[in-house]
Amino acid sequence: MVYRLIDELICYGIKNQLVDTVDEVYVKNRLLELFELDAYEKSDFDGEARPVNEILEDLMKVAHEKGIMEEDTITMKDLFDTKIMGMLTPLPSVVQRTFAEKYTESPKEATDYYYAFSQATNYIRKDRIAKDEKWVTDTEYGPIDITINLSKPEKDPRDIAKAGKAKASGYPSCLLCRENEGYAGHFNHPARQNHRIVPMTLGGEDYYLQYSPYVYYNEHCIIFNKEHIPMKINKATFEKLLEFVEKFPHYTAGSNADLPIVGGSILSHDHFQGGNYTFAMARAPYEKMFVMKEWPNVTAGIVKWPMSVIRLQGKDLAEIADAADHILKTWRGYTDKEAFIFSETDGTPHNTITPIARMRGDLLELDLVLRNNITTEEHPMGVYHPHSEYHHIKKENIGLIEVMGLAVLPARLKKEMADLETALLQGADIRGDEVLAKHADWAEKWMSENEVNSENIHGIVQAEIGKVFAKVLECAGVYKRTEEGMKAFDRFVEVIK
């Protein structure tokens, strides 16, 4: 059985250009060593390899039966199957050389190769990504994307216990650091033997390209600094983002903001995120144009979007970065008490920007999303953050991906929504249900507005979740979509013109 699986895995590796036929015997011997076998026996494998997750699942059963893999928990299996795939994955030098060769043909050819490679190695676990629920909801801002993220597996209690006992090594410093490439991992850190990164230069500094293993959208990539240095939004950030989309014109690239609440989950390591995807925000049109007198060649305007966005367009990277820097510096020091915008309180800064770059035809485009992280007693998690009436759907920070119009919602919603649908169809008392009670006000509202039945309830629930997400983005907008809010936005525009 095990010899057949080894043959099947090597066949998969050759077919997916991970293993060169020259290296076939070498890889086979490494796998024999891993499975504590001294000899090889020819199997009856017929040459048709299954998807890699199925082959690995069978190999792990063998490893568990033989006592090579102690327990069959999710974390243990992830550590072990990544170790297996690491034996098939080419050295970093090979991947970097191939990427560079493909790039000379075209940037798209290079990323096509690298994305296919990152899936073939099982670094991107396609079988898990396929579990994510995705749909599109029409809103006044156009169609927006909703996903319920199910690809991160729940931790097994045995794994949690082991992780609690494990010593913190501090190596690699975080999940983004380049030292992850080839790292074996442990109970508190994922294995990355099958992980390969691609070097590049942005703004004269060393960066690396990789894909997100969770792929929230097509070719979801991360561009991270060689050094473990904190996130910072400044003129250099704008220049680097614009330079990246010049190098990869089919990709978008943005950065999370550099302050808590409005920033992402990793503020400690300078990085951007991008990918080959047209976000709803990119489809949103200009709503109001204005001219910046020092940068007449840069097209500027407010975008029709639930958050407060200024879009800059032009052909000259330096001019756009200059204009963006002027807006950033002005915003960092800007206070408008009437609009409840305070640049700082007690010396703590509140204003920053979430920037997103893309090519639009032959024009460079930079969207600047105005952010503010002030908190109050009424809104302790943030005034410009999802408000409490929407926490039953989304209470987490609104980071870069959400800003662009893609909701990444917690896995708990899948079961909660299924249970809610069943309860409503049965006429059950959801207010008396410990888990579902939080959805009661929301559900009652749309139940009264629709003729709900078993055929349409799922579609209605999805559409209503989408509407909540649009409202959540409005919460995060510093200038509200009201007459008063737009007048306040105009006041800021007058200052930057």
Q: Which residues are covered by each model-predicted region?
A:
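Beta-rich nucleic-acid/ligand-interaction surfaces
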Residues: 260-268, 346-352
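Catalytic or ion-translocation cores adjacent to nucleophile or general acid/base/metal-coordination motifs
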Residues: 236, 245-265, 274-335
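Helical scaffold of the NTase/Pol beta-like nucleotidyltransferase catalytic core
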Residues: 194-196, 228-253
